[in-house]
Amino acid sequence: MPELLNKTKTNLNFENIKILIKKFQSPFWVYDSNIIHKKINLLKEFDIVRFAQKACSNIHILRLMKQKNIKVDAVSLGEIERALVAGFKPNSNEIIFTADLFDEETLSKVIDFKIPVNAGSIDMLEQLGKLSPGHHVWLRINPGFGHGHSKKTNTGGENSKHGIWNPRLAIPIIKKYKLKLIGLHMHIGSGVNYKHLKKVGQAMIEKAMEINEKILFISAGGGLPIPYTFNEKPIDTKKYFIIWDEARKKISRFLNTPIQLEIEPGRFLVAESGILISQVRAIKKMGDKNFVLIDAGFNDLMRPTMYGSYHHVSVVTKDDRNIHETETIDTIIGGPLCESGDIFTQKEGGNITTRKLPILKIGDYLIFHDVGAYGASMSSNYNTRPLIQEILLENNTFRTIRRRQKINELLNLEK
């Protein structure tokens, strides 16, 4: 949930932001490790917490997770390599590879390091089984329905590419190659509510009974929402656990075997820990519309453009002048890209909206809240713009965990 900079008890406050602004070139990301620790503690009832690193894959964030005994999910060869560099062990359940297909290079690496595979297609099982009989596998099941904060984050149902539609068809392949089925996984999308959660839990029970094979784990997947606006309520993690624990117990009784309950949060652990600091570089009027243009674009923060996502915005003035919060104007916030869609105030489908902001000056700073998930990890080099710096606040100090990329580093790839 966004917190006012002058009232927050976190390290993401006015004083620290002003220090960082003086020291580092905007735009840049900032994370507060204390917030991540608190979010981890909310999930301690689950047997296994596995971080969906696609939300924030910085190696230093992964190391922070490992220090707290959090395991990791990887969805690409690059994420496998990140996990290994961060200290997660191969040939164990510390890393699981989740996907709907293998490319040859990734398949080879998964086999070499004996990384368990959460298979989202029958073809994956066939390809893995031929080369690595006995490999540990999960089945990622598409329950036939989905849910998400955006149509683009819905990962269940017949319009989704994710998961195995009929998991019974996987069993002959698993037995043919003597693959070791260790778990069932179900994830229907991001921003799941309790009603959908109960439906997913029941679907997991039905699929486990239908398959009727001994397993060690079930995974609740991810999708735990966070409140991006002031009027949203945080999810009740105890209620979330109870729903899945009931499913686990029913499956355990049916299969007559103990089963561990795993959860795979991404956004929930890191979103509220991060902010994006940007600077106002141009102000102009287009007809009746007021535009404020900043030095960060959708190459940095993609979510508003891709999903129509809302992020609360705070203002820090360059000259410490007092801002009258009641004296606001409707403002469209745009970035520097040569792209009409480079607008931070839009809804899904590209409909432009406004924010009520105080009257700004060139050099003032806009702070985007709750960007620790799918912020830096979704950044690109569009318009040949370098990736920006990432900073971690930890143990009452701050350090760079990714330096600013140089343009020459981009050009050298093409020489």
Curated annotation (Swiss-Prot):
Active site feature: C338 (proton donor)
Keyword Cytoplasm in record: no
Entry-linked InterPro entries: Ala_racemase/Decarboxylase_C (IPR009006), DAP_deCOOHase_LysA (IPR002986), De-COase2_C (IPR022643), De-COase2_CS (IPR022657), De-COase2_N (IPR022644), Orn/DAP/Arg_de-COase (IPR000183), PLP-binding_barrel (IPR029066)
The reaction(s) this protein catalyses: meso-2,6-diaminopimelate + H(+) = L-lysine + CO2
Metabolic or biological pathway, per its Swiss-Prot or TrEMBL entry: Amino-acid biosynthesis; L-lysine biosynthesis via DAP pathway; L-lysine from DL-2,6-diaminopimelate: step 1/1
Alphabetic keyword roster: Amino-acid biosynthesis, Decarboxylase, Lyase, Lysine biosynthesis, Pyridoxal phosphate
Taxonomic classification: Bacteria, Pseudomonadati, Pseudomonadota, Gammaproteobacteria, Enterobacterales
Residues reported in the UniProt entry to bind substrate: R267, R303, Y307, E339, Y374
Official protein name in the record: Diaminopimelate decarboxylase
A GO molecular-function descriptor: pyridoxal phosphate binding
Binding site for pyridoxal 5'-phosphate: G223, E264, P265, G266, R267, Y374
Function: Specifically catalyzes the decarboxylation of meso-diaminopimelate (meso-DAP) to L-lysine.
Cofactor field: pyridoxal 5'-phosphate
Family according to the record: Belongs to the Orn/Lys/Arg decarboxylase class-II family. LysA subfamily.
Positions bearing N6-(pyridoxal phosphate)lysine: K54
Swiss-Prot/TrEMBL GO biological process terms: lysine biosynthetic process via diaminopimelate
Gene3D superfamilies, alphabetized: Alanine racemase, Lyase, Ornithine Decarboxylase, Chain A, domain 1
Gene from which this protein is expressed: lysA
Complex formation: Homodimer.
PANTHER family for this protein: DIAMINOPIMELATE DECARBOXYLASE (PTHR43727), GROUP IV DECARBOXYLASE (PTHR43727:SF2)
